[in-house]
Amino acid sequence: MCHTSCSSGCQAACVPSSCQPSCSTSSPCHTSCFTSSLCQPTCSTSSTCQATCVPVSYRPAVCLPVTYKPTLCVTPSCQSSVFLPVSYRPAVYVAPSCQSSGCYQPSCPTLVYRPISCSTSSCF
């Protein structure tokens, strides 16, 4: 049910094809929470968001369980630790102190969702 499309030039750490959500063009999953436009899910007018296809740490916040859903997912507000655990936050909003302490490897792309297990050899 899931499909993917990474635009030309997309960063290597795009969500694997087996784990990207499908969504309709009217779905909030289309633009809400992927911070890199190159790695947004493909949309089809005949499909709906398949949140279960994507591990929680990679899902747009609109598809996350309520427990992990921030009110504003791609604004500077996400820098606040009250919204999401660091492993579920877009890397671009992870506090610099966390990045420097090893929560994220700096060699991995910074504008994609990724878990704290991200490493230099395998971002996903």
UniProtKB/Swiss-Prot annotation:
InterPro entries: KAP
Organism from which the protein derives: Bos taurus
Name assigned to this protein: Keratin-associated protein 12-2
Region (20 X 5 AA approximate repeats): 10-117
Protein purpose: In the hair cortex, hair keratin intermediate filaments are embedded in an interfilamentous matrix, consisting of hair keratin-associated proteins (KRTAP), which are essential for the formation of a rigid and resistant hair shaft through their extensive disulfide bond cross-linking with abundant cysteine residues of hair keratins. The matrix proteins include the high-sulfur and high-glycine-tyrosine keratins.
Record's subunit section: Interacts with hair keratins.
Coiled coil: none
Family per similarity comment: Belongs to the KRTAP type 12 family.
Pfam families associated with the record: Keratin_B2_2 (PF13885)
Gene Ontology CC terms: cytosol; keratin filament
Keywords: Keratin, Repeat
Sequence repeats: 10-13, 14-18, 19-23, 24-28, 33-38, 39-43, 44-48, 49-52, 53-57, 58-62, 63-67, 68-72, 73-77, 78-82, 83-87, 88-92, 98-102, 103-107, 108-112, 113-117
